[in-house]
A protein has these predicted regions:
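Low-complexity, acidic Ser/Thr/Pro/Gly-rich terminal tails and inter-domain linkers that flank the onset
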Residues: 16-39, 45, 121, 126-131
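Hydrophobic beta-strand positions in extracellular immunoglobulin-like domains
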Residues: 42-44, 59, 93, 109-110
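Short acidic, flexible loop segments centered on an aromatic residue
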Residues: 48-66
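Intrinsically disordered, low-complexity Pro/Gly/Ser/Thr-rich segments with frequent PxxP/GP/PP motifs
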Residues: 63-98
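Terminal connector regions
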Residues: 88-131
Length: 131
């Protein structure tokens, strides 16, 4: 009987964990001590293909917000991003000061293949329908 309870607890804890729908990897590269090339890679862990993916790449220097750029990683006319696959886009920023800035990417719009609904995604809130 104890074995069944232990197995039940292990299976329920494994299934009860939240899956993260997207993993985001940001890699800044310094180019000729004048520019920063920022590569943003997003991996789809959702069980559905993503037809459109848009977000904002924010630049920070310490705690100070310096600005942001809009990035569309997947357009409607491109093939959908399948589960387990990734897409990468790059953007350039000017080097301000001696040390490079830090960057953060936030997903603002997600549209799944075959749907008309548009969602926003946040790591703490999950998917929020916006259109």
């Amino acid at each position: 009987m104890k074995r069944y309870i232990i197995i039940l607890v292990l299976f329920s804890s494994a299934w009860g964990q939240k899956r993260i729908p997207f993993s985001i990897d940001i890699r800044p590269r310094l180019i000729e001590d004048a520019k920063i090339l920022v590569n943003v890679e997003v991996v789809n862990h959702v069980g559905r293909p993503v037809d459109y993916l848009e977000g904002f790449l924010s630049e920070f220097s310490g705690d100070q917000f310096l600005g942001e750029k809009r990035m569309v990683l997947i357009y409607h006319y491109e093939p959908a991003l399948q589960t387990g696959f990734s897409t990468t886009k790059s953007s350039t920023f000017e080097l301000k000061g001696n040390s490079p800035s830090s960057f953060e990417f936030n997903i603002s719009k997600v549209k799944f293949d075959g749907e008309n609904r548009v969602f926003a995604w946040h790591p703490k809130s999950g998917f929020i329908r916006i259109d």
